[in-house]
Structure formats: structure tokens, C-alpha cells
């Protein structure tokens, strides 16, 4: 009978980013602009790479995949968050909450894998430039991206399935703006120790594994750069990696703050702030990070604008 009583929660109430009415409209406008810039920047990057033959290289293939993932996973979160600023009480059904968690988990983990793949790509480009196109064949690139998606799916399915088996007796108030697993675990009336263990192990192994690939790749890149005699050559080699290294640092810095910690140290308010960065701000910044210091992207964008102006 106790188990039956623990099946009453069929929907959750999302508290959103703030409950202060005077801030809601301002935040709605702010995050609507951020979301619009995110979509415009990432979809624009994909289109620019597609229409520019010079950018049809492994590096930009991975960048277009990263842009697609950024656009998708911000879209999993942003619409529901924006609605929460306009209504008094924002609710989400249990099944919709589970699906949001599933898709977000797949996409954010895929992004982590893609960043490590891109580090390996930069390693091959700097250390073996003459064999770059041979080593990073189209088939190999597609396999790497496919592997990243499969890895992200396995990770997210593991947590989603274990989460769906929990019982929720109430309260049903999620102190967050989306269905993130730590904020859901504290609402369950079941034993969540296994869920916490899986979250810690999977997040830790994936983070350490992907960061190890990034670290080794950049260590070998640094050694290769030091062997370059000309200052201009060293500068060119470093500039090809600086944008990616910046993106990796921001992405893993925010995610590790949230997920690689026990529930006893979990704070909803600090987690909300950090979550804004990796769900909305980072997807917006990535196109800027990869384009502002990239001469090829800037030239391609300039040509595209000139062609558009000429056609008009």
C-alpha cells in the first residue's frame, strides 16, 4: 500500500530561475535574446560551413556538428524556461520531464565527446599536417561523430531509466527551471543512492576520459609547437587550438561544478546559476569563440555578406 501511495505525482511544478515578479519580464527579454542569438549563431555557422567549399575540412565538419548540438540542447531547455517567466505556475508532466532529461543528457554528453574528438583533430592537424586529410578521412570523421552520439545516448538512457523507476510521493516542486537529475533526486521518496552512484561514476568516468584525451592531445601539440622554429609558425599553430581550448575550459568547468559532487553538497540556487551558463550562455558563445579568432571563418562570412549584398 505504501508503494501505491508513492505514485500520486504525475506532474512537477518548475519554480524557474526566480520568483520575483519584477525581474521576470526583464529576464524573459534577456534570455529570449540569448536564445535567438544562439539559434542564429549556430545555424548560421552550419550554413556558412556548408556553402563555403574552403571550409569542407574535418575541423569544420566537427564544428558544424558541435553547432547543431548546441542549437538542439539549448532548444530542449530554453522554450520551457521562457514560458516560466510569463506564467504564475509552470508545470511539466512526469513523462515530459523524463523526455526533457533524456534529450538534454544525450546532447550535453555528445558535446563533451565531440570536444575531445575535436582536440584529437587539432593534434593530427598540428603534429602531422601533411597526412591530415588522409588521417582524418570523411569515413573516420563520421564514425567519430556517430560514436559520440552513441556514447551520449547510452549515458543518458542509463540515468533516465534509473530515474523513471523511482517513486515520487510529493512534494512535486522542482526548484529549477528544467528537469535536471540532481533536483529530481531530492524529491524522490525512494532510495536514490544507486542513482547518485551512477551519476557520479558515469559523469566522472566520461569527464576524466574525455579530458584525458584533450590533455594528451594538447600536450603533444605543445611539444610540436615548441619544435617549430619560426615565431609566425608557432603563432599560427597555437591560434588553431586557442578557440577550442577556451570552449573546453568553459564547458567542463561549469559541468564539473554541477555533476561531480555528492548530493550533500548540492545547492539549488548555485546550480541554477551554473546551469544558465552551460544550457544557454555556452551554446551562444561557441560560434563567437570559434569565429572571432578564425581568419577563414571571418573571410567566409565576409564573402557571404558581400554575395548577399550583390544579389540584392
Swiss-Prot record:
Segments on the Extracellular face? 1-25, 76-99, 155-196, 259-271
Q: Name one Pfam family in it.
A: 7tm_4
Question: Where is this protein localized, as stated in its record?
Answer: Cell membrane
Q: Which residues form a coiled coil?
A: none
Question: Does this UniProt record's set of keywords contain Protein transport?
Answer: no
Family (UniProt): Belongs to the G-protein coupled receptor 1 family.
Q: What role does it play?
A: Potential odorant receptor.
Q: What is this protein called?
A: Olfactory receptor 5J3
Task: Give the organism, scientific name.
Answer: Mus musculus
Q: Which gene encodes it?
A: Or5j3
Amino acid at each position: 500500500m505504501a508503494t501505491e501511495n508513492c505514485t500520486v505525482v504525475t506532474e512537477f511544478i518548475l519554480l524557474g530561475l526566480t520568483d520575483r515578479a519584477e525581474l521576470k519580464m526583464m529576464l524573459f527579454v534577456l534570455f529570449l535574446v540569448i536564445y535567438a542569438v544562439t539559434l542564429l549563431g549556430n545555424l548560421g555557422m552550419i550554413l556558412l560551413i556548408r556553402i563555403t567549399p574552403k571550409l569542407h575540412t574535418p575541423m569544420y565538419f566537427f564544428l558544424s556538428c558541435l553547432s547543431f548540438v548546441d542549437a538542439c540542447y539549448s532548444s530542449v531547455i530554453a522554450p520551457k524556461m521562457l514560458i516560466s517567466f510569463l506564467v504564475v505556475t509552470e508545470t511539466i508532466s512526469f513523462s515530459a520531464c523524463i523526455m526533457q532529461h533524456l534529450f538534454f543528457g544525450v546532447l550535453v554528453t555528445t558535446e563533451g565527446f565531440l570536444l575531445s574528438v575535436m582536440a584529437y583533430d587539432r593534434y593530427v592537424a598540428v603534429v602531422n599536417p601533411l597526412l591530415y586529410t588522409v588521417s582524418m578521412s570523411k569515413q573516420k570523421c563520421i564514425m567519430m561523430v556517430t560514436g559520440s552520439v552513441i556514447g551520449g545516448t547510452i549515458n543518458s538512457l542509463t540515468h533516465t531509466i534509473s530515474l523513471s523507476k523511482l517513486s515520487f510521493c510529493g512534494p512535486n516542486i522542482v526548484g529549477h527551471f528544467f528537469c535536471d537529475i540532481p533536483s529530481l533526486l531530492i524529491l524522490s521518496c525512494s532510495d536514490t543512492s544507486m542513482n547518485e552512484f551512477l551519476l557520479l561514476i558515469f559523469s566522472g568516468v566520461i569527464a576524466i576520459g574525455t579530458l584525458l584525451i584533450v590533455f594528451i592531445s594538447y600536450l603533444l601539440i605543445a611539444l610540436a609547437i615548441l619544435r617549430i622554429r619560426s615565431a609566425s609558425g608557432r603563432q599560427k599553430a597555437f591560434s588553431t587550438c586557442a578557440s577550442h581550448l577556451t570552449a573546453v575550459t568553459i564547458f567542463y568547468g561549469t559541468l564539473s561544478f554541477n555533476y561531480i559532487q555528492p548530493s550533500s553538497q548540492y545547492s539549488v540556487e548555485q546550480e541554477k546559476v551554473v546551469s544558465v551558463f552551460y544550457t544557454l550562455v555556452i551554446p551562444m558563445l561557441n560560434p563567437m569563440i570559434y569565429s572571432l579568432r578564425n581568419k577563414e571563418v571571418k573571410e567566409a562570412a565576409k564573402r557571404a555578406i558581400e554575395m548577399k549584398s550583390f544579389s540584392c
